[in-house]
Amino acid sequence: MLTIGGKQFQSRLLLGTGKYPSFEIQKEAVAVSESDILTFAVRRMNIFEESQPNFLEQLDLSKYTLLPNTAGAATAEEAVRIARLAKASGLCDMIKVEVIGCSRSLLPDPVETLKASEQLLEEGFIVLPYTSDDVVLARRLEELGVHAIMPGASPIGSGQGILNPLNLSFIIEQAKVPVIVDAGVGSSKDAAYAMELGADGVLLNTAVSGADDPVKMARAMKLAVEAGRLSYEAGRIPVKDYGTASSPRDGLPV
């Protein structure tokens, strides 16, 4: 069970809702993923314009928790303003803080992310900041009181997978709040690996929406997250330099 800000969720897979080939494919992929939490960019949604298409109308919202994000923000002030818009729409008081510091790499701005998170916490939001795999920054965010930490595996949409498993392991080891690996996941292998490292969840979008078959990939991600979590809980065998026979010779008659 994944718990964020006092809310409990069965699925540890958080799914983004952007860039699907069609509303129909998006809806089917969401259903197959069995995700409880769907994230979307407030700036790309027509939450106040009824005459414009809105993917939220295609879903049974009673089945999901919506996680608006502040994608497009370059400063703390912009992120806070976007978060307030999302809250004013009545969708949710949970917000993914995303403040991009580099338009080419799409890496987050650590200073502005800290500032935005602090302000939104003061305003009563459930705050989930998207951050780099900086171990110290993750600790600083937790000290502020954020409800989860979302370190990137690699740049957003890059599909490079987990580039720095050591740092992610350090973040997971020290954190007292959920750690959700976010960004850069390219395949089910990456999702399973993140969970095997001990992450509490995985958030992804492009890996599903950009796949040749988004619906099939959504199912693959669901199974990968479940398998990775089970593997972590089971406890893997230690890595050794040399082989160890699985059938011991002690006590054999010959």
UniProtKB/Swiss-Prot annotation:
EC top class, as a word: transferase
What are the alphabetically sorted keywords of the record? Cytoplasm, Schiff base, Thiamine biosynthesis, Transferase
EC number per UniProt: 2.8.1.10
Locations listed in the record = Cytoplasm
Q: Where is the active site?
A: K96 (schiff-base intermediate with dxp)
Listed binding positions for 1-deoxy-D-xylulose 5-phosphate are: G157, A183, G184, N205, T206
**Listed pathway(s):** Cofactor biosynthesis; thiamine diphosphate biosynthesis
Cellular component terms per the entry's GO annotation:
cytoplasm
Name the Gene Ontology molecular function terms of this record. Answer: thiazole synthase activity
The catalytic activity, as recorded, is:
[ThiS sulfur-carrier protein]-C-terminal-Gly-aminoethanethioate + 2-iminoacetate + 1-deoxy-D-xylulose 5-phosphate = [ThiS sulfur-carrier protein]-C-terminal Gly-Gly + 2-[(2R,5Z)-2-carboxy-4-methylthiazol-5(2H)-ylidene]ethyl phosphate + 2 H2O + H(+)
Question: A Gene Ontology biological process annotation?
Answer: thiamine diphosphate biosynthetic process
Role noted for this protein:
Catalyzes the rearrangement of 1-deoxy-D-xylulose 5-phosphate (DXP) to produce the thiazole phosphate moiety of thiamine. Sulfur is provided by the thiocarboxylate moiety of the carrier protein ThiS. In vitro, sulfur can be provided by H(2)S.
What family name appears in the similarity comment?
Answer: Belongs to the ThiG family.
Its subunit composition reads: Homotetramer. Forms heterodimers with either ThiH or ThiS.
**Name recorded for this polypeptide:** Thiazole synthase
Organism this protein belongs to: Bacillus velezensis (strain DSM 23117 / BGSC 10A6 / LMG 26770 / FZB42) (Bacillus amyloliquefaciens subsp. plantarum)
- Lineage of the species this protein comes from: Bacteria, Bacillati, Bacillota, Bacilli, Bacillales
